[in-house]
Design a protein with these regions (language model features):
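Non-catalytic DNA-recognition/assembly elements of restriction-modification systems
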Residues: 1-26, 146, 150-158, 169, ...
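Active-site/binding-pocket entry motifs
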Residues: 42-43, 81, 235-236, 272-273, ...
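Periplasmic-binding protein-like
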Residues: 123-126, 316-317
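Sequence-specific dsDNA recognition surfaces
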Residues: 16-28, 37-70, 204-219, 233-262, ...
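A short glycine-rich beta-alpha junction/loop motif
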Residues: 2-3, 8, 78, 92-99, ...
Length: 386
């Protein structure tokens, strides 16, 4: 609850006193609308809707019957710890698990102020605390309506909107620059590898390729040790420099595990969606599970050249398993994967050209982090005093 000492003109209200849930039901096929927004179309801490589905392009579940209009706020009521709040800038349909919200009176609560209120830590903490269920927690609007906060007068709301909107614009500019820099890096890498005219060799001839296993969870003596252990999902880190789970020396000795050295490239051999074929650079010594393939470079391979090469061959690696029964990669298949190997000097030239762009990516990521923290603090200041 945002209940700091209030300035003159501020008043304590409940969310449900000034906000309403819009329940405008439509039939998707006859609504004349073209787009729908599902939960996975909304991103954490991002007020913009950047993706959507096309109505009529495939099966749309029976829950998708709530209409939203430009300016209304969409709020993901499932797993609210994901902080999914977005402002619609087009007409569309969402599921009934996505709340469509608007102010009851725009002369009391500015529509532009509402989404910033819903991004505050206090609002999110209240929503998470009052959610029901454990596997897929959800909150009812009637519970959300009990959230209390100090409502600023309209002039204060306008000033807060001006500040927060400026920060949103900064974040959007940094995000756009970051996306452009990432695209440039990928393009430079593809161009560099396409110009390599060295003969291709089977990867197993120039690298040691192996996988690991998952020690039995029931054996307590195998877990909570000091040796990093990585599941396949860690591939999304791209540069893996920390582990979330650790195993013991006993697990390393008794299970079919090897400590994979830093500088190896890990490839996700099995995975739903876009996971299979992804590559990550291992920046620490670690053990891996059975669905990771570790490519440990030999003397003729620069570790970063190998990583960038395999990262650029994402689609080729995904399709390398075609024709197999399980539609998955394996250590055997990875050993057969052909890669070009120029001399080490040329490899390092390619690496340096990519690393130069990566340095810019890191700078932008740091700017994004700092600006996002400024935005978070500004959210709190906008709704509290003292």
């Amino acid at each position: 609850m945002l209940d700091k000492v209030k300035k003159p003109g501020w008043r304590q209200v409940k969310f449900g006193d000034v906000v309403r849930q819009v329940k405008e039901r439509v039939e998707p096929e006859t609504s004349g609308l073209e787009r729908y927004v599902a939960g996975d179309h909304m991103d954490t801490d991002d007020l913009r809707i950047r993706r959507w589905g096309e109505i009529g392009s495939g099966y749309l579940g029976p829950a998708f019957h709530m209409r939203f209009r430009p300016g209304q706020v969409l709020y993901g009521s499932r797993r609210t710890y994901l902080r999914k709040v977005a402002v619609a800038d087009f007409d569309g349909i969402c599921a009934n698990t996505t709340f469509v919200i608007e102010p009851k009176n725009a002369e009391e609560l500015l529509p532009e102020f509402l989404p910033f209120l819903m991004q505050t830590d206090a609002f999110n903490e209240f929503s998470v605390k009052n959610s029901k269920g454990s596997v897929n927690p959800y909150i009812n609007f009637s519970d959300l309506a009990r959230f209390e906060f100090a409502l600023p007068p309209l002039g204060e709301q306008r000033r807060s909107v001006s500040l927060l909107s400026a920060l949103e614009d900064q974040i959007e500019a940094i995000r756009a620059a970051s996306n452009a820099t990432t695209k440039l890096r990928k393009s430079v890498a593809l161009d560099a590898f396409s110009l390599v005219d060295s003969p291709k060799v089977k990867m197993g001839a120039v690298a040691d390729i192996r996988n690991g296993t998952t020690p039995r969870r029931a054996r307590d003596e195998y877990w909570k040790g000091s040796i990093p252990w990585l599941p396949t999902g860690k591939v999304n880190d791209r540069i893996i420099d920390a582990a979330d789970e650790f195993i013991t020396e006993q697990a390393l000795e008794e299970c079919p595990l090897t400590l994979i050295p830093a500088g190896s490239t890990l490839i996700a051999m099995i995975g739903e969606g876009q996971t299979r074929g992804r590559a990550a650079m291992l920046a620490i010594d670690a053990c891996i599970n059975q669905n990771f393939g570790a490519v440990i470079p030999g003397k003729t391979l620069d570790p970063w050249y190998l990583f960038y090469l395999l990262e650029s061959n994402y689609e080729a690696l995904r399709h390398w398993s075609q024709g197999t029964n399980q539609h998955a990669l394996s250590c055997g298949l990875l050993k057969e994967f052909p890669i070009p190997i120029p001399d080490l000097n040329r490899q390092r030239e390619i690496v340096e050209s990519i690393k130069e762009i990566e340095a810019n990516e890191r700078q932008l990521a740091e700017r994004f982090k700092k600006t996002a923290e400024m935005r978070r603090v500004a959210h709190q200041v906008a709704l509290s005093v003292g």
